[in-house]
Amino acid sequence: MFGLSKMLRVGEGRAVKRLKKIADDVIALEADYTDLTDEELKAKTHEFQERIAQGESVDDLLLEAFAVAREASWRVLGQKHYPVQIMGGAALHFGNVAEMRTGEGKTLTCVLPAYLNALEGKGVHVVTVNDYLAKRDAEWMGRVHRWLGLNVGVILANMQPAERREAYNADITYGTNNELGFDYLRDNMVRSLDELVQRGHHYAIVDEVDSILIDEARTPLIISGPVDGSSQWYSVFAQIVPRMTRDIHYEVDNRKRTVGVREEGVAFVEDQLGIDNLYAPEHSQLVSYLNNAIKAKELFNRDKDYIVRNGEVLIVDDFTGRVLDGRRYNEGMHQAIEAKENVEIKNENQTLATITLQNYFRLYDKLSGMTGTAETEASELHQIYKLDVIPIPTNRPNQREDMTDLVYKTQEAKFAAVVDDISERVTKGQPVLVGTTSVERSEYLSQLLQRRGIKHSVLNAKFHEQEAQIVAKAGLPGAVTVATNMAGRGTDIVLGGNADIIADINLRERGLNPVDTPEEYEAAWDAELARVKEKGAELAEKVREAGGLYVLGTERHESRRIDNQLRGRAGRQGDPGTTRFYLSMRDDLMVRFVGQTMENMMNRLNVPDDVPIEAKMVTNSIKSAQTSVENQNFEMRKNVLKYDEVMNEQRKVIYTERREILESADIAADIQKMIDDTIGAYVDAATATGYVEDWDLETLWNALESLYGPSFSAQELIDGDSYGESGELSASDLRKAVLEDAHKQYAELEENVTAIGGEAQMRNIERMVILPVIDTKWREHLYEMDYLKEGIGLRAMAQRDPLVEYQKEGGDMFNAMKDAVKEETVRQLFLLRKQFAVANEQPAETEEGTVEA
């Protein structure tokens, strides 16, 4: 993996030179556009669109379009792209990952490729990590695009389909990876073209690409529906397990995140439930409830792995610290946690549709991304997404100082030292950003700071709505911001305060915003921004004199990249800054990987709790542990992809066929083929061997009766004049006769429907029958594939490759599912014919009865 990383970096020099040449050429065009009036500059958009219509490519227009968007950004936002931002924009346009340091202006960089590619009229998707950033960027950068005559849309949670459709039809659409992925799945569940919201996957720019394509790649997007008969056993075991004792009744492996019930535990549970054998067949489901209840107690911690808000258990992303809205643990785990927290236990769900982010983003014709920390994942981005990482130079030299880690014996001593350090920094007017790994730790530190009377803001999954306001002011003199990993993304910490965001907040407080009141907002913008900048410049100078932003990490993350993201908050745009990590021997990563060795050494040396050590051995051990976890996670993601590749190929077949049915005006030929295939398979199976005397025609006719209802019996066919004496009927004759009969009956159905509603009505009926059948069979297939995957690992014990077995059996199951779709569709359509026949007979009976009366 790391050898490939080195190889990928070899060609970076040439790529950077090429991008620098593009930036120089764009800047050389500046004079051509600065003299244009606003109307003349806006008219360039239509000119570019006309040139594309006449055969020019977006590559041909790159220099001019970038120059126009750059000038428009200056006129609208008061911000002009630096050469390095133009380089980043070009890297994105060519389908790469632009690695740009924190504070280098990735959001403004994105304006250039988004504008250029939107000129094609096929749609550009700008993907962010949360709704707030999607809305902010759509409003903020959308000001430039709208000024240039393009439409900008945003996809937010809880939007109605009509609103989503309008947003996707815009030239540029902002949204989160989850919303885009779920809309794709929902689009492949609709019953008519009018219900579709997306219009294709042309070009995507993924902000924080490492977070979305790497960190979240292990978790598939799942649309699920409730399963009937939710169990009360979750509550029962939520009362039993707290009375059980770890290492007596059960054991826990924190590293593997598994639990095992001991004999003492089994006996205890049997006694509590009043049963003789927990593992008896009739109690087999109880073991799963027990294991989940133990996991909920030992492995899933409130305010770390999840939070409880308004009576609902919400998952917290381990990497970003943000709430994963709409996500639920599967296999009953979420219900076990709900029972533990004594909130409403929601029904278990069955998967209706699913896709991994890896496979969703591979749908795009062109994909690109931005991040400040992609170097450690360059090989994975290349292997899975065919994305090359290009490091973009900083606009100014980096002056950040990264200090050595300090390691304490206990967490209490560590946090006491952290508070002392913060107090010292605040006294001299230096702003401090404190990074924590969980909601629980951030609130614990907040309590310590309150006791010391240190004013501070807390930014975690519970308060994510205030993220922009808190981060915008995190660079003010003496400001203290305690945050989970979420503060590492999306909004710059600017020394002296983020003038753009503070000005925007001030205008919104006056009732102005760029969407609802664009003219009034733009008219007030320049003066408000100038006022905030003037005040901010004075404060920024004070902060620089105090040493710039101080970033303090309270624990190492298992990913080096997350640590680097936190460090990257300091020293933006050439500002001074300092970073340091405070660790303890009881930190999760230290416990899991460094073990007792270091703690024993500290004890032998009689190191007091409040005295830290700075040892190269610790640093190396941490680096080794992080590398080990990264490799492990990479292998897990590759494994997920290998198995999902099987499902992905099947998904593409089903979704393609489904879309063709939706879009086709006439699927009569498809239905006729289904009748041929299904009935033909029935007959072929019954006549595979021997002669008429050997065929089980009774079973065949029962099956045909269930399927469509033949108008003649098997004996009538054998005795019929057309086939001569008994015993002379061939398999092909039988096949032909039954198919002719079926098609004749189907033609009668078509005549009846057409007489009432026209031919279009018949085609609609066929469509309305086949789509639910596909959805039902696909849903059942997903369940069966999940079941297959759960147990496939055991094949390794028989010296068989689980993946190969999964591919083979999954393929067989998929073919069986396709046959089942045909069979059920034919059955449903002929059932409709029978209903028509009954309906046609009923009026005659009624009429006759009336005459008799």
UniProtKB/Swiss-Prot annotation:
Q: Which residues bind ATP?
A: 85, 103-107, 492
Instruction: Alphabetically list the UniProt keywords.
Output: ATP-binding, Cell membrane, Cytoplasm, Membrane, Nucleotide-binding, Protein transport, Translocase, Translocation, Transport
Q: Looking at the UniProt record for this protein, which Gene Ontology cellular component terms does it annotate, in alphabetical order? A: cell envelope Sec protein transport complex; cytosol; plasma membrane
Q: Does the UniProt entry include the keyword Nucleotide-binding?
A: yes
* Reaction equations catalysed: ATP + H2O + cellular proteinSide 1 = ADP + phosphate + cellular proteinSide 2
InterPro entries, sorted: Helicase_ATP-bd, Helicase_C-like, P-loop_NTPase, SecA, SecA_CS, SecA_DEAD, SecA_motor_DEAD, SecA_preprotein_X-link_dom
Where does this protein reside within or beyond the cell? Cell membrane; Cytoplasm
Q: Name one GO molecular function term.
A: protein-exporting ATPase activity
Subunit composition and interactions: Monomer and homodimer. Part of the essential Sec protein translocation apparatus which comprises SecA, SecYEG and auxiliary proteins SecDF. Other proteins may also be involved.
What is the stated purpose of this protein? Part of the Sec protein translocase complex. Interacts with the SecYEG preprotein conducting channel. Has a central role in coupling the hydrolysis of ATP to the transfer of proteins into and across the cell membrane, serving as an ATP-driven molecular motor driving the stepwise translocation of polypeptide chains across the membrane.
Name it: Protein translocase subunit SecA 1
Give the organism, scientific name: Corynebacterium diphtheriae (strain ATCC 700971 / NCTC 13129 / Biotype gravis)
Q: Which gene encodes it?
A: secA1
